[in-house]
């Protein structure tokens, strides 16, 4: 059996190893996630220095190792230099990479995930610089598509309680819909309030306050099965719901009237949902928070 193999892949994460090496986590379409040592990558003028950078796509020759494989040759196929020139684009790219790292499998083909991630990096890079709203929109689009590929798309077309289709009502300024992360999507607030009212009434009927608090050794245990009242994680208006409902499309739909704060709400809803599904926080999201806080301050 050959001790070397070829793979093409994009660098998702790097770690320092020793005085001059790096450990690179690479997403490949052929073998999924690979962790390999880039020997001497931190040395001045190393041939692997630039090739081991973030979001560089390489054709690799890799030697198998006992615990870690080793990159012996690398030829760069593609880079995304525009991402590093804009903090918002870079933060959004790292955010998406973190989700990919949580989803990707090792020793299994990951072609769809590889192609999808590269496509969304390309779209982010193509944005004009200092386009805060565009970065948020493309980030939300990418997160939604990654969740869809993993089979955990949030439900945004119907109410998770009643099953009725939901349509944003732009004629009512105070119109709102609920979003429940544990339940998996959107909830009509009228249905939710009705369930709460019915639940309280049912509890009062099933468990009346006893008139005489005497012990009842032979009393039977009554088990009551009722629909759980879901936790409302967020409330969103008509614009936020409209934006969420369009994220499943291949391209971002331009909706008149959408503002930065609408996209921020959508991103934060998807962030909560993705973190719940992944079972871990998205650390790069703090960079997005810092970037847009700074942009907001600069525009006041």
Curated annotation (Swiss-Prot):
Gene Ontology terms describing biological process: DNA recombination; double-strand break repair
GO terms for cellular component: bacterial nucleoid
The keyword DNA damage is annotated on this UniProt entry: yes
Assigned keywords, A-Z: DNA damage, DNA recombination, DNA repair
Domain of life from the UniProt record: Bacteria
The keyword Iron-sulfur appears for this protein: no
Family: Belongs to the RecO family.
Function, as annotated: Involved in DNA repair and RecF pathway recombination.
Protein name: DNA repair protein RecO
């Amino acid at each position: 059996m050959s001790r070397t193999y070829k793979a093409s892949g994009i660098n998702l994460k790097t770690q320092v190893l020793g005085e001059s090496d790096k450990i690179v986590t690479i997403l490949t379409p052929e073998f999924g996630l690979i962790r390999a040592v880039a020997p001497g990558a931190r040395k001045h003028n190393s041939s692997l220095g630039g090739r081991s950078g973030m979001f560089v796509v390489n054709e690799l020759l890799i030697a198998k190792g006992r615990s870690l494989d080793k990159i012996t040759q690398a030829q760069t196929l593609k880079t995304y230099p525009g991402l590093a020139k804009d903090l918002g684009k870079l933060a959004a790219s790292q955010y998406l990479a973190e989700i990919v790292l949580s989803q990707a499998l090792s020793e299994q083909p990951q072609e769809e995930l590889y192609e999808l991630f590269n496509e969304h990096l390309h779209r982010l890079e193509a944005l004009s610089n200092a386009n805060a709203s565009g970065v948020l929109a493309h980030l939300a689009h990418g997160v939604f598509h990654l969740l869809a590929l993993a089979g955990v798309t949030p439900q945004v077309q119907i109410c998770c309680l009643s099953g009725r289709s939901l349509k944003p009502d732009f004629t009512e300024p105070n119109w709102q819909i609920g979003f429940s992360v544990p339940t998996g999507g959107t909830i009509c607030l009228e249905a939710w309030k009705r369930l709460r009212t019915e639940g309280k009434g049912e509890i009062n009927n099933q468990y009346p306050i006893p008139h005489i608090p005497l012990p009842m050794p032979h009393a039977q245990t009554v088990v009551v099965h009722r629909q759980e009242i879901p936790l409302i994680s967020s409330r969103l208006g008509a614009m936020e719901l409209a934006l969420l409902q369009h994220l499943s499309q291949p391209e971002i739909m331009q909706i008149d009237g959408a503002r930065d704060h609408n996209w921020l709400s959508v991103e934060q809803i998807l962030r909560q949902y993705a973190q719940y599904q992944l079972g871990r926080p998205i650390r790069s999201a703090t960079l997005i928070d810092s970037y847009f806080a700074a942009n907001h301050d600069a525009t006041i």
